[in-house]
Amino acid sequence: MNKKSIRDVDLKGKRVFCRVDFNVPMKEGKITDETRIRAALPTIQYLVEQGAKVILASHLGRPKGQVVEELRLTPVAARLGELLGKDVKKADEAFGPVAQEMVAAMNEGDVLVLENVRFYAGEEKNDAELAKEFAALADIFVNDAFGAAHRAHASTAGIADYLPAVSGLLMEKELDVLGKALSNPDRPFTAIIGGAKVKDKIGVIRHLLDKVDNLIIGGGLAYTFVKALGHEIGLSLCEDDKIELAKEFMQLAKEKGVNFYMPVDVVITEEFSETATTKIVNIDSIPSNWEGVDIGPKTREIYADVIKNSKLVVWNGPMGVFEMTPFSQGTKAVGQALADAEGTYSVIGGGDSAAAVEKFGMADKMSHISTGGGASLEFMEGKELPGVVCLNDK
């Protein structure tokens, strides 16, 4: 990575405004999944060890520029203190006199969590005045929030106009792993693209067709491709306005010598429920009043075989409606194939794929799970991320 990281700068005694991604799911004031807090720990611990004064900023939920009591970062700060094993202070504002006083009282190695930056309307507008207020608290800006790197907000990008800007360790790892996958992948390189809609994955499919050896398609978006081949798909998800595009992608794959894998059989159902009756049919035999909801057993075997023979696999999007047990086997099988594959580097592109490997207890078997759903998708589309562009070059 050609961007400076916290390893490239002197941090001792410096006030560091570190943007992290503490946007964790909460229920009645309790954190239900602390993955994102844990992901930021190496950076925070490094800053503490180097003798920095660590000022942490994050958003939580979508308060839309006003104070929402249940979206305060107080429970997050408390949990962070437990995980770090040290006293973590919490400011009830993200800038201004109160925050400035608390920063002024900090010693080297102290940690302070600022209030939810999205309580201020200027955050999502990337307001220069707000960015200046954030910058006034610190000597150095560290961006470790890969999950918000695709947003040009005051605390992720704007602040870098007023302070030296470097990446944290998590951001650095994300950029290294995803960057290598796109620029210099180990081969065979396979991309698995799933999820509900073609329109969400157009950019990533288009970009990856130039890079990959194998492209595997699954999830709801597969049925648009199936229909493009002239098959009936019953009540399965389909974007009729994307059928021509699906044909174009299949033609492009052929021209570029990319092996294009689609379901050969599917799990179908007449209702969405945990007790639904399902059938397995060949891809060209979906009855008119049934809906495809998962890849079938033959498809799972084919996909597992491709995965096993790949050196690098990037996975973005589930193979079916994995939240419901009867329709979860395809997604689980892909996860299992990645977990079992020897000598295969697996990159899970955040979002639903990350949720799936967590759910099936396979997370620790994956080489890299991205902390950014939208950010990793945009990165894999070849887009520049505002939260990365703003960092100082080495």
UniProtKB/Swiss-Prot annotation:
Pathway: Carbohydrate degradation; glycolysis; pyruvate from D-glyceraldehyde 3-phosphate: step 2/5. SUPFAM superfamilies: Phosphoglycerate kinase. Its main location: cytoplasm. PROSITE patterns: PGLYCERATE_KINASE. Its EC number is 2.7.2.3. One of its GO terms (biological process) is glycolytic process. One of its GO terms (cellular component) is cytosol. InterPro entries: Phosphoglycerate_kinase (IPR001576), Phosphoglycerate_kinase_CS (IPR015911), Phosphoglycerate_kinase_N (IPR015824), Phosphoglycerate_kinase_sf (IPR036043). It catalyses: (2R)-3-phosphoglycerate + ATP = (2R)-3-phospho-glyceroyl phosphate + ADP. It comes from the Bacteria. The modification Phosphothreonine is found at residue 299. GO terms for molecular function: ADP binding; ATP binding; phosphoglycerate kinase activity. Pfam families: PGK (PF00162). Substrate binds at residues 21-23, 36, 59-62, 118, 151. Signal peptide: none annotated. Keywords: ATP-binding, Cytoplasm, Glycolysis, Kinase, Nucleotide-binding, Phosphoprotein, Transferase. It is found in: Cytoplasm. The modification Phosphoserine is found at residue 183. Belongs to the phosphoglycerate kinase family. HAMAP family: Phosphoglyc_kinase. Monomer. PANTHER family: PHOSPHOGLYCERATE KINASE, PHOSPHOGLYCERATE KINASE 1, CHLOROPLASTIC-RELATED. This is Phosphoglycerate kinase. It comes from Bacillus cereus (strain AH187).
